[in-house]
């Protein structure tokens, strides 16, 4: 088997895992979107929140290898923030904005609500010039 054939075989062999990982990461991004839409309170969806799933701007390989980031731009009224997430074992690792980071193990509503609050707090702090170590997190 040539090196080229080995590459094609490997890509084919892990294609289902890649697809599953992409669905899970996009599930987190969609859950965050729903949580941000309801950040105004139950029954009061925010109409000025939108999400566009995009290729990760730092992506260097296509298709995306296992463990790499999946991304979306979130429009939060007057600003936009890039959120990147990847699956690391059974935990999601993510980053957003200039230096925001998060880890999530569950995709339930409570976890997504907590993540939405964290993103909103930290993005607000980024605009206010507050350093991440000054933030009071959960």
Question: What is each model feature region?
Answer:
Residues 3-6, 52, 56, 106-113, ...:
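Acidic-enriched, low-complexity/disordered segments with a strong bias for Aspartate over Glutamate
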Residues 2, 16, 20-23, 27, ...:
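Alpha-helix boundary/N-cap detector
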Residues 9-73:
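Negatively charged, low-complexity tracts enriched in Asp/Glu with abundant Ser/Thr
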Residues 95-97, 101-105, 113-138:
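Extended, compositionally biased alpha-helical segments that mediate assembly or anchoring
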Residues 34-53, 90-108, 119:
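Short N-terminal secondary-structure initiator segments
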């Amino acid at each position: 088997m040539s090196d080229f054939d080995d590459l094609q075989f490997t890509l084919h062999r892990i294609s289902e895992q890649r697809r599953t990982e992409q669905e899970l990461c996009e599930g987190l991004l969609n859950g965050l979107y729903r949580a941000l839409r309801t950040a105004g309170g139950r029954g009061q969806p925010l109409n000025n929140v939108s999400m566009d799933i995009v290729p990760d701007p730092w992506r260097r390989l296509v298709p995306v290898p296992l463990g790499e980031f999946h991304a979306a731009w979130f429009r939060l009224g007057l600003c936009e923030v890039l959120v990147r997430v990847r699956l690391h074992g059974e935990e999601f690792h993510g980053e957003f904005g200039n230096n925001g980071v998060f880890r999530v193990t569950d995709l339930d509503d409570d976890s997504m609500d907590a993540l939405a609050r964290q993103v909103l707090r930290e993005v607000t702090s980024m605009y206010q010039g507050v350093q991440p170590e000054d933030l009071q997190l959960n």
